[in-house]
From Swiss-Prot:
Gene Ontology molecular functions: gamma-tubulin binding
Family classification: Belongs to the TUBGCP family.
PANTHER family in the record: GAMMA TUBULIN COMPLEX PROTEIN, GAMMA-TUBULIN COMPLEX COMPONENT 2
Entry protein name: Spindle pole body component 97
Domain of life: Eukaryota
Taxonomic lineage: Eukaryota, Amoebozoa, Evosea, Eumycetozoa, Dictyostelia
Length: 1335
């Protein structure tokens, strides 16, 4: 683009010069009229033209033959015009041919049949300019009319033109026309009719205006010949300044006229007049140059401001900033750009800075090396979209009036002056051009408003028809124009999605659409052929294009939806399936979608076929549904295998799964994984097939006894078969004889092939694991070592390594441990059975089993999941050292890669005092691909079970050793009372051994052995590797749960029991060693306390087992309950001794359930006594603290009691005062009653109202009394007698004490009325009462 800047600068200078030249020429011609105007009528005519309206371009004379020759050269590659029509009514008369005379005095024959001299004064674009990309254009040949006086006026008016505006001048691609204007001169002798054929000529605008002092001399050297018959000139052709400069520089401008040998004098006079006119024009140009130089200064100031704006736009592009500075230095002040050019530069820079549509994986995986190696198209294809033929519908650009690439020009043909038939032909020609993305003569691109949104619909190109068109034709054209817009959009979509980064699925879609576009172009060419044969009309064209419009509408919807969703890979397929269900209402549309989907899914199905049949992924553009994590690598797959490799090496992309394979995505993943495993084992799939066939043949041959001749024949056949198999394997070593998957509407086709591939891959891998890698024998070896199935090996190993395991963890010699392990393996029965005994190694875990189990169970207590740290057991990396003071330990802890690391959890689990017995574990080296089944997680589960069983065996061994020592030293016990104590210890020890033996028997014979047999049988009948993995994991999970290692409560109970047994055994052994310092009372207390602890632990364990066994998943615990509580021994014992655990409840509640006492080796008796003394001191301190607390509490209680007593006394005094006040009031009332002697009954007293009130209150307030109306009347009667009889007031109060509610109401009655008012009422009431009493 920067290389075109000088040309654009020249265009602006040239046009500004033309504008100023026209203004100066107008002023000079008005002040100084031209010479010889009277002598030459032609000059009179030109003078009239200049005086009527200002001239726009300098009038020069050019040989018409040159114009015709140039036109013929430009149109050599164009098809001939399809039709010609005349504007005038008179036919063209014959004319004479003349050879033009050039400046070099050499004559060349002309190819034209008419000779005219034309001058142009144009402001409109050329009427017949032919773009280089158009297929065919219509040439309009205008024929001039005959010479007459009436036509002279018309031709003169046609010669006058309007001056060009600035908007027309700044268009860099506006083409000046060469419209001829005929001037006819009337002669007295004859009237000649001449014809001037209107031709088109494309004149370049990038011509620099240069001064040439030899113009006049060159013109004087030209030999000009005149027309015969007294006719000087028939017409002039006025050309713009550009054509004049081109004419002068090339020395090719000549004048041609019809030659007549009889009129030489007239020709010479005419030639002289022409030369004078040229001289005058040259003088005007010299005057205009001064004015142009002054305008340059102002122009440069304006352009400097525009340059600053352009530099701001180019600052974002760091690569191009240096080039811009170099260009500015090179051109300097001479680089002048038009405003339109600057707008185009600004738009291109804006497009470059805009965020381009890119696939999603380019944003998420910018650092991937595979992304960096993707090929790309050059940047100029994006920066300069006008070089591509799809620029009309560039999706990233909205075409406004400032951005259109020299489009939306005025109509080049005036349709109003053309007949209807030819007007329709012009419209058809323009439609054919717009159908392939090219503007026509009358159909242009519609201007898009700048305020419109930037959606995809706004980027759809709209075409506008200009000029006067019939309504019927306009309607047909408007129906066809959407097809042109759809074609431009779809074509640009193809150009964008053909980029490399969009992937092969998008490429296949673009290829399928491109095939449809080729057929579309064939249809356009067929329509053009009918147009040339004049058999095509708009109606016929609409009839032919109706199905095509519907097809392109669907293509537009598909492409626009893909662009809107920014779909990539399989997303395009899913989108096509969605649109198919939405728009496929008829068969043709369904067939179109089927064609697109079939072509689009072809590369995906090839990738799928390669994955499920060979286990290979070829996905350069991240389009396949399986993603390969290339960052996850393994240096040595046989020794240091990581489970993450199998789980995370291949993963499913959820957004790239086709809808018809959604339910089978996991099966597709595992199928390719299986084949990849076989490939990782350095064994091709085809070789595996051949190996299976050869094994079957060998087995059949071994079973049948053959003669010697038959054996020779079989050998020959086998050799020939092997040769054929080798040839096949050499040609296609990695190919499987399977059919390629093809697209089908029936999903069962895919499902059947995927199922077959899955069964085949799983069968190959199972055969590899079971038959070649001996999976069952490996599992049997792990059972022997980790599950303690071989008693002779384990007992021998414990005896030989017991002294070493008593040491602390940092003092254990790993070389010695491994050597002792191998010794015990060689000397036991396993040495003959197991071929893989060398893969077993010793390993020490630097924390206790309790901490490990509780950490796994309560893994959410930590911020991050914990890691199990293991010890490196390789004898090559570990050196044996016995120096405890050295800082370098013999055990190097390494973090396992199966779980996530958590330093905080590791520090919590790690203990300082840890012995070899507590941390011993086995490690087993499993090679690839057996590590798929026996993974690192599975080995950790085996280690947990082994550590638990080993701890039980160790406690059992310690208890048995104590019994043997007691039996050995029993004869030396002479101290009285000691034998009875030992009998109690034997009894408790026997109970502990019984508990341990039954627990071991339950775990080994009722949990591990039956579950292992089930696993073995199910593996033999399994069909896939995933089934084998699932069966093995289920076996380990059931073993852990049934061995009571997955519940915190059960784990704490078991660990407390183990620690109790260890402490009791150490106590009894140390007691026997120090016979002199034996304290019988202290021994009795320790024995009784340990017995109580044992019973408490056993009772809690049995209660928890009973509660757990109620659920169906824990029915297995019933067997352990029956074994521990055989014949209800312990249950009856606990029932007979209900007070056994009452004293222990308070102490046990204070202790935490999650922490168990550490397991320690045997200590001396003195050390144990010291520990007991320390414990006693601590207990005394605790008791003192408790006493102090109790005293404080008692004091507080006494204070509270005193306060309560004081409050009660105050309340009693207040009540007494209130009672006294009430008694005083009652006395006053009685005195008043005695004075009145019963005559003081209230005047307003009413028995009926009182009775009703009494009934209402009793019914509303209480329902417990259940009083009847008769009792109410009795109460009222008593009250009335009491009021009348003042002497018997006390008696009435005692009688009514049983009804306090009535008393309250009676007291509330008013007593101001007199008895005289209610005497009659009282009599009636007494009569009623008497009747009631009688009843």
């Amino acid at each position: 683009m920067k290389q075109n800047q000088p040309n654009l600068n020249v265009n602006l200078n040239n046009r500004l010069q033309q504008q100023q030249l026209n203004q100066v020429a107008q002023q000079q011609l008005q002040q100084q009229p031209l010479k010889n105007t009277k002598q030459n009528p032609i000059n009179n005519q030109t003078n009239g033209i200049l005086n009527n309206k200002p001239i726009t371009t300098s009038s020069n004379i050019m040989n018409s033959d040159n114009i015709l020759n140039n036109n013929n050269n430009n149109n050599t590659n164009k098809p001939s015009s399809t039709f010609n029509f005349n504007i005038t009514n008179t036919p063209p008369p014959p004319v004479n041919k003349q050879k033009p005379i050039t400046s070099s005095s050499t004559s060349k024959p002309s190819n034209t049949t008419t000779t005219t001299t034309t001058t142009t004064t144009t402001t409109k674009p050329p009427s017949n300019s032919l773009p280089s990309s158009s297929s065919s254009k219509v040439k309009v040949n205008s024929l001039t009319s005959q010479n007459n006086n009436n036509n002279n006026s018309n031709t003169n008016t046609n010669m006058t033109t309007q001056p060009p505006t600035f908007n027309n001048l700044i268009k860099p691609q506006s083409l000046p026309s060469t419209t001829g204007m005929n001037e006819i001169k009337n002669t007295p002798t004859r009237t000649t009719t001449t014809t001037s054929t209107q031709h088109t000529k494309y004149i370049k605008e990038d011509i620099v205006v240069k001064e040439n002092n030899n113009r006049i001399s060159n013109m004087n050297n030209n030999n000009i010949s005149g027309a015969s018959g007294g006719t000087t000139f028939n017409s002039y052709n006025y050309l713009p300044n550009n054509t004049l400069d081109n004419f002068i520089n090339n020395s090719n401008t000549t004048t041609t006229t019809t030659n007549n040998n009889t009129n030489n004098n007239n020709n010479n006079n005419n030639n002289n007049n022409i030369i004078n006119n040229i001289k005058q024009q040259h003088e005007l140009e010299l005057l205009q140059q001064k004015h142009i130089e002054e305008m340059k200064i102002l122009q440069n100031e304006q352009l400097n401001q525009l340059k600053k704006q352009q530099k701001k736009l180019n600052e974002s592009d760091t690569d191009g900033s240096d080039d811009d500075d170099d260009d500015d230095d090179e051109y300097g002040e001479n680089m002048n750009l038009s405003p339109r050019t600057l707008r185009e530069l600004k738009n291109i820079q804006r497009l470059k800075n805009l965020e381009k549509f890119s696939p999603p994986y380019l944003i998420t995986k910018k650092t991937s090396p595979s992304i960096k190696t993707l090929p790309k198209f050059p940047e100029w294809t994006k920066e300069r979209p006008f070089l591509n033929y799809g620029y009309l519908a560039n999706i990233s650009t909205n075409y406004t009036s400032l951005i259109l690439p020299s489009k939306y020009e005025q109509t080049k043909i005036q349709l109003s002056s053309i007949p209807n038939y030819f007007r329709e032909q012009i419209l058809i020609e323009d439609l054919l051009s717009t159908m392939i993305g090219i503007e026509g003569e009358c159909i242009h691109i519609g201007v898009v408003q700048e305020n419109e949104d930037d959606s995809l619909q706004s980027n759809l190109v709209s075409f506008v028809v200009e000029g006067e068109v019939d309504p019927s034709n306009n309607d047909l054209v408007q129906r066809i124009l959407p097809l042109c817009s759809y074609y431009s959009f779809v074509n640009d979509f193809i150009q964008i999605r053909y980029a490399y980064e969009w992937g092969i699925i998008n490429h296949s879609l673009c290829f399928s659409i491109d095939q449809l576009l080729k057929e579309y172009l064939v249809l356009v060419s067929q329509l053009e052929g009918q147009l040339k044969s004049e058999r095509l009309s708009l109606q016929r064209m609409w009839f032919y294009l109706q199905p095509t419009i519907k097809t392109f509408e669907i293509l537009y919807r598909v492409t626009s939806e893909i662009m809107r969703c920014n779909s990539h890979g399989v997303q395009v397929i899913n989108l096509l399936l969605k649109l198919q269900s939405k728009y496929s209402s008829d068969k043709k549309t369904d067939d179109l979608f089927h064609y697109l989907i079939k072509a689009t899914t072809l590369p995906f199905l090839e990738m799928l076929d390669l994955w499920i049949h060979q286990g290979i992924i070829r996905d350069t553009y991240f389009e396949f549904m399986i993603e390969e994590n290339t960052d996850l690598k393994r240096d040595n797959i046989n020794r240091d295998f990581n489970d993450l490799y199998w789980e995370q090496r291949y993963q499913i992309r959820q957004d790239q799964i086709p809808k018809y394979l959604q339910s089978h995505a996991l099966k597709i993943l595992t199928t390719g994984k299986y084949l990849n495993v076989v490939r990782e084992c350095n064994q091709s799939i085809s070789q595996q097939q051949q190996h299976n066939k050869s094994d079957n043949n060998n087995n059949n041959n071994n079973n049948v006894k053959l003669n010697s001749q038959q054996q020779l024949l079989l050998l020959k056949l086998n050799t020939t078969q092997q040769q054929q198999q080798q040839q096949l394997s050499s040609t296609s070593a990695s190919m499987i004889p399977t059919t390629i998957i093809e697209y089908s509407k029936n999903e069962n086709v895919y499902i059947d092939k995927i199922e077959k591939a899955y069964d085949y891959a799983s069968g190959i891998l199972l055969n590899l694991l079971i038959n070649e890698r001996h999976l069952i024998s490996r599992l049997k070896a792990i059972k022997h070592y980790f599950l303690l199935c071989k008693g002779d090996f384990f007992s021998h190993f414990m005896d030989t390594t017991y002294d070493e395991l008593k040491k602390p963890l940092d003092q254990i010699n790993m070389v010695k441990m491994n050597s002792l392990l191998q010794l015990s393996l060689r000397t036991s029965s396993i040495s003959e059975e197991d071929e893989f005994k060398d893969d077993l190694e010793c390993e020490f875990i630097p924390y206790k089993l309790v901490d490990q189990l509780l950490n796994i169970i309560n893994i959410n207590n930590f911020n991050n999941p914990t890691t199990t740290t293991t010890t490196n057991t390789s004898s090559n990396n570990i050196t044996a050292t016995t120096n405890t003071s050295s800082n370098n330990t013999t055990i190097n802890t390494t973090v396992n890669t199966t779980l996530i690391q958590s330093t905080s959890a590791h520090e919590v689990l790690k203990t300082n005092k840890l012995f070899g017995i507590e941390s011993l574990a086995f490690n087993y080296n499993v090679g690839w691909p057996l590590s798929l089944i026996i993974s690192r997680k599975s080995l950790i589960k085996y280690q947990i079970i082994f550590r638990h069983l080993f701890l039980c065996k160790h406690v059992e061994k310690v208890l048995v050793d104590t019994w043997s020592q007691h039996q050995f030293r029993r004869s030396s016990y002479n101290k009285p009372g000691l034998s009875t104590l030992l009998s109690f210890t034997h009894l408790l020890r026997h109970r502990m051994i019984h508990f341990l033996q039954n627990l071991e028997y339950y775990m080994m014979l009722e949990v591990l052995e039956p579950n292992w047999n089930k696993m073995k049988n199910s593996i033999k009948t399994s069909k896939t590797v995933d089934d084998v993995i699932r069966i093995h994991n289920d076996f380990l999970e059931t073993c852990l749960t049934e061995c009571m290692l997955t519940d915190t409560k059960l784990v704490n109970i078991l660990m407390k029991f183990m620690s109790l047994c260890i402490t009791f055994a150490n106590f009894t052994n140390e007691m026997m060693q120090d016979e002199k310092n034996i304290d019988t009372e202290q021994i009795k207390k320790t024995i009784s306390s340990s017995e109580n602890k044992f019973h408490a632990i056993l009772k809690v364990l049995m209660d928890t087992l009973k509660s757990f066994s109620k659920t169906e998943s824990n029915r297995h615990m019933i067997h352990l309950i029956h074994r521990l509580d055989y014949n209800g021994y312990y249950s009856h014992y606990f029932e007979n001794n209900p007070n056994l655990f009452k004293n222990k409840t308070s102490s046990s509640s204070n202790k935490s359930n999650n922490v168990s006492p550490p397991l320690e080796p045997r200590f001396s008796y003195q050390q144990q006594q010291q520990q007991q003394q320390q414990q006693q001191q601590q207990q005394q301190q605790q008791q003192q603290q408790q006493q102090q607390q109790q005293q404080q509490q008692q004091q507080q209680q006494q204070q509270q009691q005193q306060q309560q007593q004081q409050q009660q006394q105050q309340q009693q005094q207040q009540q007494q005062k209130q009672n006294q006040i009430q008694q005083q009031k009652q006395n006053q009332i009685q005195q008043q009653q005695q004075q009145s002697r019963g005559s003081t009954l209230p005047s307003n007293f009413s028995f009926q109202t009182a009775l009703q009130q009494q009934i209402n209150t009793t019914s509303a307030t209480t329902t417990t009394s259940n009083q009847s109306p008769h009792t109410l009347i009795d109460d009222l009667k008593k009250r009335a007698y009491g009021i009348l009889d003042s002497n018997n007031t006390k008696k009435t109060l005692e009688r009514t004490s049983s009804s306090p509610a009535l008393d309250n109401q009676s007291n509330s009655l008013p007593m101001t009325q007199s008895i005289s008012q209610y005497a009659e009422k009282l009599k009636n009431l007494r009569a009623v009462i008497k009747n009631d009493e009688l009843k």
